[in-house]
Amino acid sequence: IGTTTISGVVLEKNETQKARILEAKTIENGSFLATDSDWERIQDAENIVKKSRQMLDDFLDRYPEVEKIGLTGQMHGIVYIDKEGTCVSPLYTWQDARGSLCEEKNGSLTEEIQQTCKVQAASGYGMVTHIYNLRHNLIPDTAVSFCTIMDYFGMQLTGRKEVLVHASNAASFGFFDAQKNTFMTEELYKMGVEEPWLPKVCTGIEALGSYRERIVTTAIGDNQASFLGAAGNEKNTLLVNM
């Protein structure tokens, strides 16, 4: 699930476990929402889910032997989720610039984070967006947590109510300790973010549930997915992009 396009691919493994592409398809995302603020870059999360589900259903109808459904997509951005696992906000994309706005005497939020927490977090990172939204009362009252758009798609497919985010996507939010695979709760607390907001994190590819009798797995970041697509999962592999 990208920012400008949504893509799907049907893969089949042969006897050597090499993946063979049976079909690939890309459509326009076209879900940006009009806004009065030129720094705001938000998308219609439910429209994205609708388009993604239509593509998936088309594949499943024509390839009934499919066994598993893997997910990936645009990193950094967040949608807010209520206790029923339903999206209650637009998708705040990685292009959103609210974290770079100058506020009173403190400069921008990203500068304040660097000074207060010694953490490098760019505008568009989920935690930066969340901190800004907290301070400006922009979060819906029913929201209890947040996740990426592909995490939300997985929840909608499986009926899951609790957010589960792969470490690759959790790290893209910012304020994440990649060595410990946990959020920096002490630093987040300094910025007003309490632990109950934070989504549960997994380090492996886990089963979220099922859709049309196929296993749906946790979404990984598009950066990681592109590496696997180009280099595979062989150990000690280096990929150089020019």
Question: Where do the protein language model's features map onto the residues?
Answer:
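Gly/Ser/Thr-rich active-site cleft segment
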Residues: 1-3, 114-223
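Short beta-strand-to-turn element immediately C-terminal to the catalytic PLP-Schiff-base lysine
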Residues: 10-12, 79-82, 133-135, 155-158, ...
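Catalytic phosphate/nucleotide-handling subdomain of diverse soluble enzymes
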Residues: 214-215, 219-242
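Conserved beta-strand and immediately adjacent loop positions that scaffold enzyme active sites
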Residues: 7-9, 77, 172, 184, ...
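Short beta-strand segments
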Residues: 70-73, 147-150, 219, 240-242
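N-terminal glycine/serine-rich phosphate-binding loop of ATP-dependent small-molecule kinases
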Residues: 1-89, 115, 142, 199, ...
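Pocket-flanking alpha-helical
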Residues: 101-105, 226-228
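Carbohydrate-associated surface elements
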Residues: 96
